[in-house]
Curated annotation (Swiss-Prot):
Mg(2+) binds at D460, D462, D464. Zn(2+) 1 binds at C70, C72, C85, C88. Its EC number is 2.7.7.6. Residues 1384-1407 are annotated as: Disordered. This is DNA-directed RNA polymerase subunit beta'.
């Protein structure tokens, strides 16, 4: 018996391994795999259905068809195990060996492996230093190649045509060898001596001068080095023996009706065997050369088709005209082995059904239909029935269950109690799409889902379906309960805000009960406590919305954590007081003593979680939901057409707008405005009008006049059903109500431009035919967009997951001093994101001091900033904090807990092993479908605002200038002459309240540090023109002004004033080519003046289309406008918005016309122009010059004599992220990416924490480029994983040798995923063939560090609970005990860093 058990065990064992290596298979290796040679193309005998001997399904080679039974039936049963039948040659063993035993085909002539030939760059070509075309001509028998020149003048690897070959044979007889076909290539590859070739190339690379040659040599050196290191031989890229896949992996299945379904591979193998056998015969018969050659070529083609059909020439098709699936097709693409069977598998013990709402469930429960539960938990029920003695065998138990006896249901109840199930809704865009619940048995066939988790699943009840899975093992159940339970997923991992938030009906009910109305029954009554009030309400003494006074008892917690009771009488309403009854102890009544809109409810749940913890919050959320439903039912809110009130002012406002449009039309016809300006102005007018009508409508709907208790008529918020729904955040938005009751507004054409005639009607009035067609235009575009968006968004998520999948938290502290400096984000003067939101949950990198006081730090280094710390920082008026960031983390693989900071979904420091990469990818990808696909024209979008032309202060305080260069005008105002200047407004504590960018040429009405009042105008400028300002006083001198050539004189009809416009380059003709019109400022005697602080003369180059209003010789003062450039033209640039913009940023694509940044700091001057380019020179402090040639059509935004700093924009445009990295470094790049990506999401109202974007940026910066190889083995210009260079340099420094120098490189997410160290992960992402070819040549070893690789090889992932398993495996193989291991892994904090946090629950370190 013992032997029998051992026998079963030895077949179950799996290999334990730490890495996977891939390489080229030598012919000897292929033969060692083989269990016999396949000699015939036959598959099975059509009469007996038994495999043919020596055929593709031969039992003698591949093993028996039935377990322990030979083919002829002589040996049966297990007792003959291992016997080889002498009659049919089959070994008696398990049939499943037919899945693992390989065969082989001995090829009559060598054949090139198509992957190493055609997968670019061609490895065979690189190895032989021949072009792919030449090698193909040799392989496919079109040319000879010299393999051994002997003493003849021919050269090795020289190609000869048929004629040249015959001529050479006549001249030199047998002194040389030249052949064609794969034999020739095989010979050439076999002759290569890798070591000496390597030495020769290394010598050559030093002396070579040409750039292209250098590239080619570097590639060859890398390739040959790879061959030497991996132990591969070049001639193995040519096949002399072909392996045959085990037959059960290319099955032949009988269908009913006597036909067979077969795998395409069998057809492909059959062709190879047929041609190979035919070739053998021809060679035996020594047939004419031309026939043999043709047969060899056909053999080569059939092997090509088997390995990768369609890679060369036309794909071989089967009977039904579709290309046959070759071995390469089996592994690549969505249906390939990687993505279909290894990364995504079907799961047993699962069910799916429609979902319905379960308003009486608790948060941790879901309703499971009885039938479904019985099917899912069948094995458990069988076992219990047997254990109870209700059934003797499994069969009997099965009968009981099928009859659905009464006791079965009782046992099912017991089985499912405390056994969580996992619910999943597709598409699973983030980890909240799979959560665990405790099942409750229900009648019917639909699954009941708790309403509060709908947001997380993005589920609604209009026919959505969900899948149920049963965690079977104890560990799985434990993880489902501890980590995946819906009650543990209250906060969203994307932004740390509650995701379990009531919506729709619940919000409506809570909002309805918390509204206060004037003059309701019982107003002014005073109650001793809430229960007294409840009695009064139940007896209809007071109404729900009446304003009353109630005594509330609260429990307060002081700083030391002591709790005390406090009573206070509050002004509130009946509804709010009733709501306070469900408040958990410890939450202040203030939180519900307000209108419970969706925002406030979210804030309430958030406060509850932070103050009271998880358990109380879950119970509270449930109570809120029940209450909300109850009062929504009582409210009985419904909408009807009378709720859509059209404002009386609408007619009047429309009349005014139409009048304005007419005026502009007249101006256009008399030529005062251009077509573009007219369009922009009309769109502007209608946008403004729409806003005005919408505001009037919201005022009409949202307020009503009522009589209060004193008999006065007052305004109060109305109880209009439509308004209630929008105001509470339950359903609908002002945008939608505006279309129902105000006006539909401007519509968008499919290309994103705006139709200038708006829809003046609303849906209540109804649209006219023309209006209806205008509106269908935009609506159809919307639907088409949605379909595209879903696919694009899914693909973005896939790329993001792929690039970050191997990033986990690996240690507590990497000990780095680096970090990013965080400041509030200000746009258009408003603080869009205050500092507190940006630093919350981050770890401080440097001590933070009070502004202007460097003695006592407020917050010390390595403190995790939680809500209390952030409040302290805000109180102190701190404006910038340096925090640790994943980008600057120095952990070798992964990130450390302190650089990452708080786990947003849990609210404490992140645990060891958390897969922060995948979380980041999901958080960014999940809202992808909410983003638009639009490109915006800055002409004004359907929601455009009018152009800004001044800065008006919103808060009182003092003014502070930063980076601002200005000159003082004669009249005392200041004129800005810098581009990056900013004005901030500080409050009394020195905290920045507003910040504005100042354009060049703006007039500033205040001095630095002056006091300002709110509403005061600080600065103004002309939004439609870009001025050129003189920095010195003197007289104007025109240079190169030639009438009719470089300038066009224009006289204004109305005013009679003349101005000169600089002519466009195209209009100048030949004599104006080299003229450069400029204005120079001179003194009385006509000598050039210089710009203060430089030795450059004060002259201003005038770009085309600029307008000069001065006359030659006119006096100018400091700060006067010399010329102005109309802004109209440069503004039509499209802004890519939405999803495409996010994808462009993550792919690190260069914009079309990128901004040109200053390569160094210095003073600007202009040199001689070339044909289509302008020459701009930057002269730095030590006098060296840098030249930049800029196309004439680009707008240079700097002037002669201006001082620029390195990395500043000198030519307008979108900056390229690569330039920012190169000139400014990693921190500004990170800031740029975070800002740009956040702008897109913020526009859609999506909140994502910065750290997710930083995590992805870290992965984009994984590689570095070697600038100077030093004594390392890297090559100049090579891109290497940063960690490899750091390790290599450490070794070099230890040996006192020169380390390699390198620069960081920014890779797009697709490139970064393919350039990962793991070839398994890269191959399963994209370009499978290329990745595997490259890896095989290099003999790459995959250390299985990431998540994907481990899923593919079928192990636990090295993240979360799997991380302990992996570290235990690693240490037990070295022979360490558990306790030794824990000291190594770092239960203690490493590098002596303490993590401090003032919250009452301490942070669990190390998980």
């Amino acid at each position: 018996m013992k032997d029998l058990l051992n026998l079963f065990n030895q077949q179950r064992q799996t290999l334990d391994f730490d890495a996977i290596k891939i390489g080229l298979a030598s012919p000897a290796l292929i033969r060692s795999w083989s269990f016999g040679e396949v000699k015939k193309p036959e598959t099975i005998n059509y009469r007996t259905f038994k495999p043919e001997r020596d055929g593709l399904f031969c039992a003698a080679i591949f093993g028996p068809i039935k377990d322990y039974e030979c083919l002829c039936g002589k040996y049966k049963r297990m007792k003959h195990r291992g016997v080889v039948c002498e009659k049919c040659g089959t070994e008696v063993t398990l049939a499943k060996v037919r899945r693992e035993r390989m065969g082989s085909i001995e090829l009559a002539s060598p054949v090139a492996h198509i992957w190493f030939l055609k997968s670019l760059p061609s490895r065979i070509g690189l190895m032989l230093d021949m072009t792919l075309r030449d090698i193909e001509r040799v392989l496919y028998f079109e040319a000879y190649v010299v393999t051994e020149p002997g003493l003849t003048p021919l050269e090795r690897r020289q190609l000869l045509t048929e004629e040249q070959y015959l001529q050479a044979r006549q001249e030199h007889a047998d002194d040389f060898d030249a052949t064609m076909g794969a034999e020739a290539v095989y010979e050439l590859l076999r002759m290569i001596d890798l070591q000496s070739e390597m030495a020769r190339l290394r010598e050559e690379i030093v002396v070579t001068g040409s750039e292209t040659k250098l590239k080619r040599l570097t590639k060859r050196i890398k390739l040959i080095e790879a061959f030497i290191e991996s132990g591969n031989r070049p001639e193995w890229m040519i096949l002399t023996v072909l392996p045959v896949l085990p037959p059960d992996l290319r099955p032949l299945v009988p269908l009913d009706g006597g036909r067979f379904a077969t795998s395409d591979l069998n057809d492909l193998y059959r062709r190879v065997i047929n041609r190979n056998n035919r070739l053998c015969r021809l060679l035996e018969l020594s047939a004419p050369d031309i026939i043999v050659r043709n047969e060899k070529r056909m053999l080569q083609e059939s092997v090509d088709a088997l390995l990768d059909n369609g890679r060369r020439g036309r794909a071989i098709t089967g009977t039904n005209k579709r290309p046959l699936k070759s071995l390469a097709d089996m592994i690549k693409g969505k249906q390939g082995r990687f993505r279909q069977n290894l990364l995504g598998k079907r799961v047993d013990y699962s069910a799916r059904s429609v979902i319905i709402v379960g308003p009486n469930l608790r948060l941790h429960q879901c309703g499971l239909p009885k039938k479904m539960a019985l099917e899912l938990f069948k094995p458990f029920v069988f076992a219990k029935l047997q254990r109870r003695g209700l059934a003797t065998t499994i069969k009997a138990a099965k009968k009981l269950v099928e009859r659905e006896e009464a006791e079965v249901w009782d046992i099912l109840e017991e089985v499912i109690s405390e056994h969580p199930v996992v619910l999943n809704r597709a598409p699973t865009l983030h980890r909240q799409g799979i959560q665990a619940f405790e099942p409750v048995l229900i009648e019917g066939k639909a699954i009941q889902l708790h309403p509060l988790v709908c947001t997380a699943f993005n589920a609604d009840f209009d026919g959505d379906q969900m899948a149920v899975h049963v965690p079977l093992s104890l560990e799985a159940q434990l993880e489902a309960r501890a980590l995946m339970m819906s009650t543990n997923n209250i906060l969203s991992p994307a932004n740390g805000e509650p995701i379990i938030v009531p919506s729709q009906d619940v919000v409506l009910g809570l909002y309805y009960m918390s509204r206060a109305l004037e003059n309701k029954k019982g107003e002014g009554m005073v109650f001793a406590n809430t229960s007294e009030l409840k009695r009064a309400y139940d007896n209809s003494v007071v109404e729900l919305h009446a304003k009353v006074k109630v005594r509330i008892t609260e429990i307060e917690t002081d700083d030391r954590g002591l709790r005390s009771k406090a009573s206070l009488i509050v002004d509130t309403t009946v509804g709010r007081a009733l709501l306070s009854e469900i408040l958990p102890e410890g939450l202040p009544f203030v939180l519900v003593n307000t209108e419970m809109t969706k925002k406030n409810i979210s804030r309430l749940i958030n406060s509850s979680y932070r103050m009271l913890g998880l358990k109380d919050t879950v119970v509270f959320a449930d109570k809120l939901m029940y209450t909300g439903y109850a009062y929504a039912t009582r409210a009985g809110v419904s909408i009807c057409i009378d709720d859509m009130l059209i404002p009386i002012e609408k007619k009047e406002i429309l009349g005014e707008a139409e009048q304005e449009v007419l005026e502009i039309q007249e101006q256009y016809q008399s030529g005062l405005v251009t077509a573009g300006e007219r369009y922009n102005k009309v769109v502007d007018i209608w946008s403004r009008t729409n806003e005005r009508i919408a505001k009037a409508m919201m005022d009409t709907i949202g307020t009503e006049k009522v009589v209060n208790t004193d008999g006065e008529i007052v305004d109060q918020k109305s109880m209009n059903s439509l308004y209630i729904m929008a105001d509470s955040g339950a359903r609908g938005s002002p945008q939608q109500i505006r279309q129902l009751a105000a006006m539909r507004g401007l519509m968008v054409r499919p290309d994103g431009s705006i139709i200038e005639t708006p829809i003046k009607a609303n849906f209540r009035e109804g649209l006219s035919v023309q209006e209806y067609f205008n509106s269908t235009h935009g609506a159809r575009k919307g639907l088409a967009d949605t379909a595209l968006k879903t696919a694009n968004s899914g693909y973005l998520t896939r790329r993001l997951v792929d690039v970050t999948q191997d990033l986990c938290v690996v240690q507590l502290d990497c000990g780095t001093a680096g970090g990013l400096t965080m400041t509030p984000i200000v746009e258009g003067g408003d603080v869009v994101e205050p500092l507190k939101d940006r630093v919350l949950g981050r770890v401080v990198a440097e001590d933070v001091f009070l502004p202007g006081n460097d003695d006592e730090p407020i917050v010390t280094r390595s403190t995790l900033l939680d809500e209390q710390w952030v409040a302290k920082l805000e109180e102190a008026g701190v404006q910038s904090v340096k925090v640790r960031s994943p980008i600057t983390c120095e952990s070798p693989f992964g990130v450390c807990a302190l650089c990452y900071g708080r786990d947003l979904a849990r609210g404490h420091l992140v645990n060891m092993g958390e897969a922060v990469g995948v979380i980041a990818a999901q958080s960014i990808g999940e809202p992808g479908t909410q983003l638009t696909m639009r490109t915006f024209h800055i002409g004004g979008t359907a929601l455009s605002a009018a152009a800004v032309d001044n800065i008006t202060v919103k808060t009182s305080g003092s003014v502070k200038f930063t980076n601002l260069k200005y000159v003082e005008h004669v009249n005392g105002t200041l004129v800005a002459v810098s581009r990056s200047g900013e004005i901030s407004v500080l409050d009394t504590h020195g905290r920045e309240r507003e910040r504005y960018k100042l354009p060049y040429g703006a007039t500033i009405n205040v001095k630095d540090m002056a006091e300002v009042k709110s509403g005061q105008i600080l600065a103004n400028w002309d939004p439609h023109n870009h001025p050129i300002v003189s920095e010195v006083a003197g007289f104007v001198r025109f240079i190169d002004f030639v009438d009719g050539v470089t300038v066009i004189e224009k006289t204004d009809d109305l005013t009679g004033l003349s101005s000169r416009e600089i002519a466009d380059l195209k209009r100048r003709g030949s004599q104006g080519k080299d003229l450069r019109p400029l204005v120079r400022i001179v003194d009385k005697k006509g000598n050039d003046l210089t710009i203060p602080g430089t030795d450059l003369s004060a002259q201003y180059l005038l770009p085309p289309r600029s307008i000069v209003n001065l006359q030659d010789g006119a006096p100018v003062g400091i700060g006067d406008v010399v010329a102005k450039i109309p802004q109209e033209a440069s503004k039509t640039r499209d802004i890519t918005g939405g999803l495409p913009r996010v994808a462009d940023l993550f792919e690190a694509r260069r914009p079309k016309d990128p901004a040109i940044l200053a390569e160094r700091s210095g003073v600007i001057s202009f040199g001689k122009d070339t044909k289509g380019k302008q020459r701009l020179i930057i002269k730095d402090a030590d006098g060296s010059e840098h030249e930049e040639l800029i196309p004439k059509y680009r707008q240079i935004i700097v002037f002669e004599g201006e001082h620029v700093t390195k990395g500043e924009t000198i030519v307008d445009g979108e900056p390229s992220p690569q330039d920012i990295l190169r000139l400014l470094g990693i921190e500004p790049l990170a800031a740029y990416l975070v800002k740009e990506i956040q702008d897109v999401y913020r526009l859609q109202g999506v909140k994502i924490n910065d750290k997710h974007i930083e995590v992805i940026t870290r992965q984009m910066l994984r590689k570095v480029e070697i600038v100077d190889q030093g004594n390392s083995k890297f090559l100049n210009g090579e891109q290497v994983e940063r960690q490899r260079v750091i390790d290599e340099n450490a070794k070099l420094i230890a040996r006192n040798e020169l380390p390699a120098k390198y620069n960081p490189v920014l890779l797009g997410i697709t490139k970064a995923s393919l350039a990962t160290e793991s070839f398994i992960s890269a191959a399963s992402f994209q370009e499978t063939t290329r990745v595997l070819t490259e890896a095989a040549v290099r003999g790459t070893r995959d250390n299985l560090r990431g998540l994907k690789e481990n899923v593919i090889v079928g192990r636990l992932i090295p993240a979360g609970t799997g991380q302990r398993y992996h570290s235990q495996r690693r240490y037990s193989s070295v022979g360490l005990t558990q306790s030794e291991m824990e000291t190594l892994v770092g239960r203690s904090t490493s590098s002596g860093t303490e993590v401090t946090s003032p919250s009452k629950d301490a942070i669990p370190l190390g998980g």
